[in-house]
Amino acid sequence: MSNTESLNIGKKRGSLTIYIGYSPGVGKTFEMLSNAIELFQSNVDIKIGYIEPHQRDETNALAEQLPKITTNFTKHGSHHFQYLDVDRIIEESPTIVLIDELAHTNISRDRHEKRYMDIEEILNHGIDVHTTLNIQHIESLSSQIELMTGVHVKERVPDYFIMSADVLEVVDISPEQLIKRLKAGKVYKKDRLDVAFSNFFTYAHLSELRTLTLRTVADLMSDKEKVRHNHKTSLKPHIAVAISGSIYNEAVIKEAFHIAQKEHAKFTAIYIDVFEKNRQYKDSQKQVHQHLMLAKSLGAKVKVVYSQTVALGLDEWCKNQDVTKLIIGQHIRNKWRDFFNTPLIDHLMSFEHSYKIEIVPIKQIPVELKMNKSPYRPKGKRFAIDMLKMILIQIICVMMGLWIYQLDKHESSTIILMIFLIGIILLSIWTRSFIIGFLAAIINVFVFNYFFTEPRYTFEVYRFDYPITFIVSILTSILTSALLKQIKFQYSITKKQLYRTDLLFQFNDSIKQTYTVENLLINAGYQINQLLQQSITIYVINQSKVIKTIPLQNHIDNTTQQHEQALSWVIKNERQAGATTDTFPGINKWLIPIGTSPIKGILAIDYQSSQVINPYDASILESMLNELSLAVENVTLLKQTRESMLQAERQLTHSNFLRSISHDIRTPLTTIMGNLDILVSHSKDMSIIEKEQLLVHSFQESQYLYLLVTNILSLTKLQSSNVQIKLQPYLVSELVEEIDMILERRHLKKRITVSSSVNLQFIHIDSKLILQALFNLIENAVKHTSTDTKINLSIRYASYEQIEFAVIDEGPGISLEEQQKIFEPFYTGSNKYFKDNQKESMGLGLYLVQTILHKHQSNLQYKPNQPHGSIFYFNIYTDFNEGDV
């Protein structure tokens, strides 16, 4: 779900060059423009995308020497501002584009919140970018620089983007030279110099910033070189940082990042959820979310773990994940809070562990953050409510005890103690604090002593065994309370885990039973709606276009122009956008692309930018999206595999067809040409009988060719999806007469008999096709039986509404194995009775008959003849509706 991954959009990613300086005024833009002019004079296609408007004549003069890409304007208040036109840069696609002020925050947030995101999109389209940056705008250094200078920097660039730069060029001048430039008014107007010199631009600050810049760039280049040479090294230290809702946690994360960078370690951010339900916990979730996003932007892998206490969860996770160093923030001492709660560091140190613990001191936290931090507010309201619950249960126990005591003053002590123990159990279930159970256990003893032991209504004790009873009672109550709290917590964890497991199981089950991308997206949308309780719209994508919009829960999708732009951007860049992201943050939908390049769909979740997904739901959603993407790719791959198999089958069929037809056409043509050649060359030397034999043989070969071509043309015509056949009423007796005429012409009357018990009956058929089907069946019987085998064409009523046509022979029949294949195209069978002067069938006859009959809503069937032989038959309805099929 990371928004920081670069995507391949069909082009190689462009090269990023950053001109970095330690302060405004060192000459970054001037240096960038000077180098650009040299490249332009060398015929490099280089253009200015955006240069910050300057009061410096030298910089403006350089900018005039380069071609510019037109910028856009936006109105903010009563002022108009220029801003980068990303689409125009991508459209013009120069080799190199110059873009000033990398850390700038866009005034118009219609597309990206930050300029570095604009640059990242341009890089992804294969365009090289040269840009400028001051050291104080690097995310991980901002807190450190704030400590140095006292100036809080709001515009920041994440470290991963700086580390992705191909070239880091330091623009450096001495602090003395910079101060001279400032005094000369070359950086700021002279009326602003007093403020500048009193805050940021002091010699001490500039010297520290210069040193930090040189060291940071050197470290970055060194780190890149080490990564390049040690890329295959698997043994790396593992640095973990504890995430919390504390305002100090931001600086702790940045310090942990620096440590991980220096040690070239695996970096993980770990958040321990202890299932608090109070308002303070809910309010901290937004801060936790921001810290998790910060850790992600610094390259950390984020983990959410559930535990009874933060210390226990951290310790168990660090041991299981082979963490070498755990980074936590310094504990802020508070005597009242520490009296009831063990500080995290003390709790961690009580465990046996092999990892190191490093504490980031509070003095490293910027002064402004300390001042803005809200004071610690103890959980007084919740504690007061729990105290009232304890008092109520105590009163109930006393009232019940007094009633039982009145019934039996001598034997009621045990029962009354049990009532107080039950009160402890109820209190442990009803309240959250362990302290309440502890206090109740002690108070119970004093209440019991006061009301139910002699002398009553005093705290004096006469019997020597009562102190022991009281101690045992206290210990029993405390242990019972502790065990119940533990069981209650385990129940909460189990309930959460069961909810997660059940939700993921339902999700996996729903997508496993789905075999289309559209249905996968719909099922996933309903499951995610159940998780987040937000309306969802599905966009099905094909060939980079939205082909279908499916709103769920009867949700009306009011798509604005900005929504359309965001959708197009997500399709093009294959990254998340909208609410909860920094791209198109103004729209009220969170757009999540599904599937790898190209994406197959988009889930649009209704969300406001102010809303935050808690870490628990975020982890479930991430699992769901990963499973969905995998399922979509599997379905797509399965579809592609099926299409490939069908294509291969078509190619094989086509190849078999060409091979078969070339043989079947070439052989009779060769015979005909040979016979005619003999007649032309040797006609004078041949008798009339010999000439007739050659002519008859040539005629038979021509008939075979005619039948072959007719079958192929008919089959091709019938298989065409837009071909219709014309059904007309036709007398069965006329059909019989035409069959007799064909048999007469083919000299088959002696072998084939036609028996019909149907005469004056109309059937609705395409007569030419049915005649062709019947003749193919007769031809098939002739080819597959011996010359003395009788063949019968039977026409009779199969029922009141159907007439059966059957071709019956007394040949060898067809084996069970071959019966499964006889209607397949190009299947020729054993051809046991073919003679030398007969042509082997092409295997299309029965297939063509079946195709013709399907057009008549009928079906060719086979059954064995008794005692031997074959019967091919089909039925035609007598009342079939006339019309086109």
Curated annotation (Swiss-Prot):
GO terms for cellular component: plasma membrane. It is found in: Membrane. Its EC number is 2.7.13.3. The modification Phosphohistidine is found at residue 663. It is a multi-pass membrane protein. It comes from the Bacteria. The chain crosses the membrane at residues 384-404, 415-435, 436-456, 464-484. Disruption phenotype: Inactivation of kdpD results in decreased transcript level of cap. The gene is kdpD. Cyclic di-AMP is a negative regulator of the Kdp system. Keywords: ATP-binding, Kinase, Membrane, Nucleotide-binding, Phosphoprotein, Transferase, Transmembrane, Transmembrane helix, Two-component regulatory system. Induction: By the Agr/RNAIII system. This is Sensor histidine kinase KdpD. It is an enzyme of class 2 (transferase). GO terms for molecular function: ATP binding; phosphorelay sensor kinase activity. It catalyses: ATP + protein L-histidine = ADP + protein N-phospho-L-histidine. Gene3D superfamilies: 1.10.287.130, 3.30.450.40, Backbone structure of the membrane domain of e. Coli histidine kinase receptor kdpd (1.20.120.620), Histidine kinase-like ATPase, C-terminal domain (3.30.565.10), P-loop containing nucleotide triphosphate hydrolases (3.40.50.300). Residues 660-880 form the Histidine kinase domain. Member of the two-component regulatory system KdpD/KdpE that regulates the transcription of a series of virulence factors through sensing external K(+) concentrations. Also regulates capsular polysaccharide production. May function as a membrane-associated protein kinase that phosphorylates KdpE in response to environmental signals. In turn, KpdE functions as a transcriptional regulator by direct binding to promoter regions of target genes including spa, hla, aur and geh.
